[in-house]
């Protein structure tokens, strides 16, 4: 833009921003270009010819993943290669946290183990299926693959899972419209029997993160997959998070009995209130209720939608006695990681002077009764609605979480209520953006800006929620001018902003939150050649907060297709007409170099050369055992393959037939032997009897 036009542009932009309308060009950069590309779209545009769109097959072809030979250990070694984009590295680590929260699968940096997963920036997004025992097993997170559910999807392949729609019973649930599929891509819709992949007796899952979308490999604009239950037509192909059935299958496959970082969840639906106890060190008690006259009218878990259910814990402050306290303590918990996050919803129907204190009671050898430590004091609690709170803990000994309600002075008609408590060994989000009356905003087709926030490094930022589209919701991250700008490094280097639309399911393990991350690359330039992440006062536009304070807002960076409005209205994103967006901005500059590897490196080529002369039959897979190539043969519950090349098939039925035949044969032989023995014995005694008779006759003759 010509320099003499710049002041007029600022005036015009300021007018639009103040009026609540978007600035020219919305002053944002859409990293998706307005197109919500799935994994298979990305790979197709790159011209990749991968099995089922994102699976790398070994030379032996499609292998069965039935049997323990194809499982990884519960802790999987990995390397993040330096070729990966910085944003992708951070997203991968966040995906690992989702695995830890919901399964017993863990990940550790490679330290010389025989087999490990090497994550690199290849062409597209793809993985092998199962542990192929190749030493270095590659998994590609290429350009535009740096979305958390995409990473989860590819690692599920590596853990041994095929796509949901290829399972043996899929024709009972979906219809494949073959004439709408791209020519030459029909094989991506093949169906496979239980000898190749096992559904683990879990129902067909329309919501699986491993399912194709309805538009997969289409040759036009019409759907290639039609669900037999029409309500799931726009559900299949979700790329937000694991579904419940995804987790059930994964936990069954790896015999998980618990998840690694999850600690506790309580919605107070059961009378035992999740093992929580009333303290003896207070002057009142918390009560389990489903409604309070002064509010809340219903719990947060069910929002009054389920009859005879919907409970929360309530501390009554209407007595008017200032300083009255009630302490509710969790069951004893045992930490493993040294950091935890407590999440809960709080409702204030009393006076503004009431407060909630969150403590930990930590038990050590020297303090058998526990040491009470204040972790957070919550004052000035808004009244009339449920509010979400997070409390960060750093506990290393066994402990309890303690909720203390404190009544304020003066008259009060209500009290404090808590519901939907979750405790996990994860990092709490840094900030919460609570948007109320969201349905009204959604219908207004407007752009909404968050309040200003600060990152842990001191950078000021703002989030832009774009509701102007009738079908999609956009989400953008802006740096803004702040109090620390003179002391900060510019252009802003390697700050990763993670923005999460919260699925408000009461149990953190059952959520399918929608998340997107972007990272500030200090070398990234804008269309006019200026650094995108430079100081906002230098490259931004003038804007105003609602109170009239002026500031500078840098260009937004994000996506116009963050989520469809249809998905936004599903699950529990929108609850009580409230939406929560969780925000974390952290420095990931330490991830610049991650590929240092120790000792001798097992190479894929050695394994492939050894197996190149071996052809395993019937879905067997070639592996190295002490340097020798051997076929690992697939097996099911009542069948198996055997032999040097898995060329022979055995089954329980065959074994029974053989066993019965052998038994009959042995019985027949024994019977024959017995009959012969009896015959010979009888013949022997007949001869003796005949000889004795002859002797007696001779004696009688001599007597005469």
Curated annotation (Swiss-Prot):
Extracellular side: 21-654
Expression sites (tissue/organ): Kidney, intestinal brush borders and salivary ducts.
Protein name (record): Meprin A subunit beta
Propeptide: 21-64
Glycosylation sites: 193, 219, 316, 422, 437, 528, 547, 592
Recorded coiled-coil stretches: none
Site entry (Mediates preference for acidic residues at subsite P1'), positions: 239
Subunit structure: Homotetramer consisting of disulfide-linked beta subunits, or heterotetramer of two alpha and two beta subunits formed by non-covalent association of two disulfide-linked heterodimers. Interacts with MBL2 through its carbohydrate moiety. This interaction may inhibit its catalytic activity. Interacts with TSPAN8.
Activation/inhibition comment: Strongly inhibited by fetuin-A/AHSG.
Active site annotation, chain numbering: 154
Residues that bear Phosphothreonine: 693
Topology term for the membrane: Single-pass type I membrane protein
Keywords: Cell membrane, Disulfide bond, EGF-like domain, Glycoprotein, Hydrolase, Inflammatory response, Membrane, Metal-binding, Metalloprotease, Phosphoprotein, Protease, Secreted, Signal, Transmembrane, Transmembrane helix, Zinc, Zymogen
Localisation per UniProt entry: Cell membrane; Secreted
Recorded consequence of changing residue 274 to A: Predominantly occurs as a monomer, less than 10% occurs as dimer
Residue span, MAM domain: 261-430
Superkingdom, taxonomy of origin: Eukaryota
Underlying gene: Mep1b
Domain (EGF-like): residue spans on this chain: 607-647
Keyword Signal listed: yes
SMART domains, alphabetized: MAM (SM00137), MATH (SM00061), ZnMc (SM00235)
Catalysed reactions, semicolon-separated: Hydrolysis of proteins, including azocasein, and peptides. Hydrolysis of 5-His-|-Leu-6, 6-Leu-|-Cys-7, 14-Ala-|-Leu-15 and 19-Cys-|-Gly-20 bonds in insulin B chain
